Amino acid sequence: QNAFGKILDQYAKNDTEFSNRIVTTSPDVSVSTNLGPWINKKGLFNRNESSDTFRDRKIPSTQKWIFSTSGQHIELGIAEMNLFLLLGAAGLSHELFGERLFPIGTVYDPFISRGLDAMNYACYQDARFMIVGTPSGISLAPEGGAHQSIGTPLIGISQPGLLSYEPAFADELSAIMNYGFNYLQDENGGSIYLRLSTRSIDQPLRNLDKNLTNDILKGGYWLKKPGSNPEIIIVYQGVMANEVIKATGYLGERFKDAGVLSITSSDNLFNEWKKKSISFNLQTSKSHIEHLLQVVPRDTKII
């Protein structure tokens, strides 16, 4: 989630035509989903201009709550249905008004379900937006069971017109967001769902080459390629990366050829496999997941 905020902040600093077409919105969670730096640079939208109340009253605040007609963040109350109604409307601006916007909404991941009806209709109309669900999983467990999201990956997979990603590392997220903004404009594209977390994850020191970037966008890659005779491979998605890396270290002596497969989009992997595997007899090319697993012997255990 922190990386998401930094990426948006960099867009704001560049002040390009692209960044001027980004519109962010959130249901009362803008600061806690790392939109703060973006808002400080781009301001809040309102038809009536108003100054920063905190500054006027000399109250210390890291945020600049300045409202104007040129602001690029729309602050909502705790109303997730309104969030998706807004994303749907802004995501159709190119069809309605001939001007492309890039709507980005942030929401606590467990509360995506509050706005499913509006999200479904937005996707049905082919609205183009990016929804960022964060924090996800059990990151918000101290706030109660209702704040834990376990089933939201199923929403991402099952919703037509919405492509879901769950990256573990910042460089993956950057590549996915760059691709995502092009996907929003593609005639055959759609909307993007990013499932992120506030959990700290050790970042790999690497440069993403073209092949690795393509694998990330297709939905998966080998974080650690298996040896010639792997007894096991470990498959993970998202913030489980820390546990998987530790487990691989513990198991290294016993299973030297073990591989680690990182899944960035189970949605993409499944949909491509389904399209290419309608009939195994007529299959002319392998899906990405089949390409990844072709180096794994049939009797290898998958964890």
Which residues fall in each region the model found?
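Residue-level signal for short, function-critical loop segments
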Residues: 28-30, 107-110, 135, 198, ...
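General beta-strand structural signal in soluble alpha/beta enzymes
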Residues: 25-26, 105, 131-133, 164-168, ...
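Thiamine diphosphate
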Residues: 34-154, 157, 164, 172-178, 245, 261, ...
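Short coil/turn connectors at secondary-structure junctions
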Residues: 18-22, 68-71, 96-102, 125-129, ...
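Short, charged N-terminal helix-start/capping segments
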Residues: 2-20, 98, 104, 157-175
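Conserved acidic/glycine
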Residues: 1-80, 88-89, 231-240, 246, ...
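Hydrophobic helix-cap positions at the C-terminus of alpha-helices
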Residues: 11-15, 90, 94, 122, ...
